[in-house]
């Protein structure tokens, strides 16, 4: 609501009404995101990133058939496309697999759900604050709506897991607390998501709790850098987030005597969370 108040004198976004209009929006969103990441020093852009994003640009969907995510994308695909950080990670794992054979393949359960969903959800808002929508203030409203939907979805799933609500009642929370009634347009997505998260306790909430952990990690990392008298750079943070683990450093820590080990700076729990490498093939959701 505060974002809408800020933008009250601006014209509203207009949804794409034809394949040509959607394709133009999607192409513009990809170009805008990649330019932003590269020119604003957000992250070192690998050759695999733009092709990975282009492979998931989507296509025009008639208004009466759009579910929540594609409703937002037909106004501006960029907020949803930033969540596609997932595809950047999967492309990187294809070209730079984890050195440990134990962590190269898919696990029976995606224990990294908080890491990957939290990061994908977190960068949506981080990129907004870093200036991605400075030339399209109304698009900021979509970022908040996407986050509100994840929060409503996760809250409903918590009630269901606690046996305080049926899945249908949890879905009602999901619908009622998503802004603009955009979860009431297409019931298949609602049923699918509530069923998915009912079967995986903690997954539905991981989008929001994982986002918090990413933000906490950013704060912890920035403080560590500044305490060393160095200048914080956002690109360094995301590059380290994307980097494979330094196995030699970890090995040295394990082999060092106890007294020497104390000389290493303590790594916060959130930093450890963020620096996990996600195994290839894990399930990734919007």
What is the predicted role of each segment?
Residues 1-286:
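Long, His/Glu/Asp-enriched segments that create or flank divalent metal/ion-associated functional microenvironments
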């Amino acid at each position: 609501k505060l974002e809408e108040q800020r933008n009250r004198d601006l014209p509203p976004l207009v949804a794409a009404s034809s394949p040509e209009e959607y394709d133009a929006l999607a192409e513009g969103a990809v170009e805008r995101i990649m330019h932003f990441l590269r020119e604003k020093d957000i992250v070192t852009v690998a050759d695999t990133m733009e092709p990975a994003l282009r492979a998931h640009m989507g296509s025009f969907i008639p208004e009466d058939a759009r579910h929540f995510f594609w409703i937002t994308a037909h106004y501006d695909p960029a907020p949803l496309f930033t969540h596609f950080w997932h595809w950047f990670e999967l492309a990187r794992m294809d070209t730079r697999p984890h050195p440990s054979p134990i962590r190269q393949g898919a696990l029976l359960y995606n224990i990294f759900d908080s890491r990957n969903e939290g990061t994908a959800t977190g960068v949506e808002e981080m990129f907004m604050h870093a200036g991605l929508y400075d030339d399209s203030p109304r698009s900021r409203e979509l970022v908040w709506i996407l986050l509100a939907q994840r929060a409503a979805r996760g809250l409903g799933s918590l009630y269901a897991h606690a046996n305080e609500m049926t899945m249908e009642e949890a879905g009602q929370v999901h619908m009622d607390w998503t802004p603009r009634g955009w979860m009431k347009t297409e019931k298949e997505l609602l049923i699918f998501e509530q069923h998915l998260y009912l079967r995986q306790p903690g997954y539905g909430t991981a989008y929001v709790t994982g986002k918090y952990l990413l933000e906490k990690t950013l704060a912890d990392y920035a403080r560590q850098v500044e305490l060393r008298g160095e200048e914080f750079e956002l690109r360094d943070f995301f590059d380290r987030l994307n980097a494979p683990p330094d196995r030699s450093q970890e090995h040295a820590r394990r082999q060092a005597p106890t007294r020497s080990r104390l000389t290493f700076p303590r790594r916060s729990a959130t930093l450890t969370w963020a620096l996990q490498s996600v195994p290839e093939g894990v399930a990734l959701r919007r």
